[in-house]
Amino acid sequence: GIIYTCNPSRSCKEKVEELAAEIPLVIINNREELLEIDAVELNNAKPGRPMARHLLELGHRHVAFVSPPLTSKQGQRLKRVEGFVREFEEAGYGDGVIVKSADEDLDEVIPSMDSEYKMGYYLTKELLRENKNLTAIVGMNDMIAFGIMDAVLESKLRIPADISVVGCDNTVYSSFRSISLTTIDHYVP
């Protein structure tokens, strides 16, 4: 059998369904309503909450969440953002959260580490121009957070003294000593 660990892109959904008809296949990540394939769904709202709680505990009240496009196709991405925003709202600071997502036309592009890094970088540059009072920026995932970090540092700001940066997924890169990214494992209990 096959364990498929991400949602198939539109361009390969048909192939994945054909494969599932021949070989036992399960998707671990998000339940895609349009696919007739077994799936183990992750709770994508869950990681957003501890990221927000961590920042609230550090005293952050003006934060941004940087994301790939938040389209109907990417409902799971939206759940992570919603969990983050909900935590700030429940603490009484919902007005201090900015959600900055990439243009919807980028949703048709198969995401790569390079494109996610660039999204984090360019969206953060925009955020820093538009919002001088931000004290923390969160990336939907670690690759976006790496782009955020470079944009912050290039703007002559210090991490975490001036702006805190948080990622999600706890990728191997986040543990490199030279990077020092605060990140959360997606599989939060």
Regions found by a protein language model. Give the residues of each.
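Bacterial carbohydrate/catabolite-sensing allosteric modules
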Residues: 13-189
